[in-house]
């Protein structure tokens, strides 16, 4: 086994599967008091380790762990006044706590985007067990943009593979197919 730290929630192995009847839980920021809380009332999908430079990562982690859930199942339940969008120009509008910096959820507002209607959440912010498990790693090469030396990439890809997280330098094939099919439908090439 390769000794490379990916993310605290997967470094000791990925817990497989989520509870079939799991109906969500509460995400909490890291503030000591007056926590921002977000209720997620559904099971997540497409959970993955993400190496992009935009996603929130805990201290020392090379990757975030992030999943999607229908936006209608995401509701801020405490301290919405503490949330601020990190980058107004980004496709995913990441709502972060102004107190601790944790990203509570990300939302795509562009109705023409293939993933419109899905919110991005970090289930590690929840105390509840049963969330879907990470199944792949996306935007792996992007960790170089945040300071990882390129010569470490072979070891990182090896570690991701050992953890059962196939490494991609984009999204998983199923998600890339969904994006491409969305474009083809908009062009009238698919129905």
From Swiss-Prot:
InterPro entries found in the cross-reference section: CENP-V/GFA (IPR006913), Formald_GSH (IPR014185), Mss4-like_sf (IPR011057)
Pfam families in the cross-refs: GFA (PF04828)
Chain ranges passing through the membrane: none
Catalyzed reactions per annotation: S-(hydroxymethyl)glutathione = glutathione + formaldehyde
GO annotation, biological process: formaldehyde catabolic process
Group of enzyme by EC: lyase
Record's cofactor remark: Binds 2 Zn(2+) ions per subunit.
Cofactor: Zn(2+)
Residues annotated for Zn(2+) 2 binding in this entry: 50, 52, 55
UniProt cross-references to PROSITE patterns, sorted A to Z: CENP_V_GFA (PS51891)
Sequence ranges assigned to domain CENP-V/GFA in this UniProt record: 22-169
GO molecular function: S-(hydroxymethyl)glutathione synthase activity; zinc ion binding
Top-level division of the source organism's lineage: Bacteria
Residues where Zn(2+) 1 binds: 29, 31, 97, 100
Enzyme Commission (EC) number: 4.4.1.22
Keyword entries, A-Z: Lyase, Metal-binding, Zinc
Keyword Nucleotidyltransferase: no
UniProt-listed PANTHER family: CENP-V_GFA DOMAIN-CONTAINING PROTEIN-RELATED, GFA DOMAIN-CONTAINING PROTEIN
Family (UniProt): Belongs to the Gfa family.
Xref: HAMAP family: Formald_GSH
NCBIfam families the UniProt entry points to: formald_GSH, PRK05417.1
Function: Catalyzes the condensation of formaldehyde and glutathione to S-hydroxymethylglutathione.
Name of this chain's protein: Glutathione-dependent formaldehyde-activating enzyme
């Amino acid at each position: 086994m390769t000794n490379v730290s990916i993310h605290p929630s997967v470094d000791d192995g990925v817990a497989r599967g989520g509870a079939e009847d799991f109906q969500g839980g509460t995400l909490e920021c890291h503030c000591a008091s007056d926590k921002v809380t977000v209720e997620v009332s559904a099971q997540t999908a497409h959970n993955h380790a993400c190496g992009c430079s935009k996603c929130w990562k805990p201290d020392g982690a090379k990757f975030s762990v992030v999943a999607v859930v229908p936006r209608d199942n995401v509701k801020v339940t405490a301290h919405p006044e503490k949330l601020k969008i990190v980058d107004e120009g980004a496709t995913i509008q990441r709502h972060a706590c102004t107190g601790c910096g944790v990203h509570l959820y990300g939302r795509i507002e562009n109705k023409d985007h293939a993933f419109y209607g899905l919110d991005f959440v970090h289930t590690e912010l929840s105390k509840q067990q049963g969330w879907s498990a990470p199944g792949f790693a996306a935007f792996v090469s992007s960790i170089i943009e945040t300071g990882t030396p390129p010569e470490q990439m072979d070891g990182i890809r090896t570690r991701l593979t050992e953890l059962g997280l196939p490494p991609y330098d984009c999204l998983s094939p199923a998600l890339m197919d969904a994006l491409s099919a969305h474009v083809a439908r908009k062009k009238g090439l698919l129905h």
